[in-house]
Amino acid sequence: MSGIVSRLSVLGKVWLGLAAGALALIVFGLAAPGSSLFFPLVSLWCNAALFALALLVLRRAGIELDLFHKAVLVGLWAAAVLYFYWTLGSRTFLYHWDYVNYILKQYHAEAAFAQNTGAGFRFLLDSITEDYTNFITLFTEFPFCLSGKTGDDYAFCQVFSVLPSLLVLLVGLTVKVGRMLRVKNRFWYFLIGFSWCATFPFVRMSAVLGQPDWFGLIFAFMLMLLTLDYRFDGIDLPRYLLIFAATAGIILTRRWYLYFVVGYCFAYVLLLVVSSVRLAKSGQQSRAVHRMVRLVVFGLCAAGAMVLLLLPMVRKILSFDYAGRYSYYNFGGITLELAAQTLRIGLLNFILIGMGLWFAAKRRLPALPCLAGTELLVSLVLFTRVQNTGSHQMLLFVPGWLLLFLVGSAALADGLKKHTAVKLCYWGFTMVFAVSVRCSPLTTVALPGFVVDHFPLKAVSEFVRLDKLTYDRTDAAQIQRVDDWIDAHCDAEK
């Protein structure tokens, strides 16, 4: 037995350890139902399994991280810990409305598992048709269980439960895109591309406000890593299973991520059709036909299995009037949404995107910009048929925008021989600007806090006042006294 284990790869040993851990959890759950340790241990196992799955996706995608990549990854994660600690500690934010939903779900999940193991898992499964599923609570319980269990604690704990897997996959995506674009200056490309994407304000916006919806980006990055350069030239069952798992994971995170899935799949199929037509014209008709046959067979099988797996959700989607339910949030349609996207992305990012489009056109590498643009357009059109986006729903567009940022980073890195100081200053200024952006419920334009507080236009002075008051409450003590009085003098049963 020891000889078999010794011959396993490191990743194989990790999966063996996870299997042993799962077995131990099953025994523990049966032996001690209702134990306060069971749910945190399940959460710890889920986080370990998710990280191992991320590493498995990297391996299947042909990505190997060297010491430089790992050092930058660890350094940026450490910087993120400091950023969250400082940001959450320098404000007084009251978690309410949408911003308290996940925290309450975490409390309810803990209470359900405190009853017994079956009640806990039943609580998780019963939410599959809801707007906010309980899927994420499996991963955020640890290390939230070790904290003071406040709203700020919940936001901070995401740095340990969500961010590691997210950053590992973002590193892999950065390397993958650089390889596809045949970047020459790989050192600067990786530094610029990875840091640019990781500091994009709308990646972390919802997390800072207590909404762990960025968890879905983990599965979005998995899907992109597994498909960006895959053309169905051969049968790859492990890859198919991973694609299916990533798609199911992103749908279970938040239902509106379905718009990204539909948009990305449409763009990917369109890209594959175009490449197959070009193959056929070059005399490789048989190869082109086999590509399309494999794609159609996989697509039909995956769609059928997904419908069966998520049948309650599918029934809810088909029978529910979402346009009527969310009409309150449909405040301008696609015209206003395009304006909102423009303001959120900002001039600095659009300059980078423009450089990337020129770079791709000059090198005759249109696939990635076209894929990202098509995905963004389809997702945008479909989503605005129901409602307009808030800051957290911006996450469903983030993968497409990040893909365009990476193409622009390739252009910036390979063009450093000219105007080096100017380009590095542009990158550095953008990083400082992005990290300084205020993450507020009222954020419309991604601007640093000191810019928002001293915005020169009098027409928006009231909006600025409300934004500052919402982000950093000065009346928290008064609200607490009112709450204490209600608790002391009012009977909840009456």
Range-by-range predicted roles:
Residues 3, 49-59, 166-176, 269-279, ...:
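Hydrophobic, aromatic-rich transmembrane alpha-helices
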Residues 257-258, 267-277, 291-333, 341-352, ...:
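Membrane-lumen/periplasm interface segments of specific transmembrane helices
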Residues 430-494:
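Membrane-embedded, lumen/periplasm-facing catalytic core of multi-pass transferases
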Residues 3, 70-73, 187-191, 241-245, ...:
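Signature aromatic-anchored transmembrane alpha helix within multi-pass, membrane-resident enzymes
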Residues 156-184, 222:
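Transmembrane-helix motifs of polytopic, lipid-linked glycan transferases
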Residues 205-215:
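Short acidic/glycine- and proline-prone juxtamembrane loop motifs at membrane-interface regions
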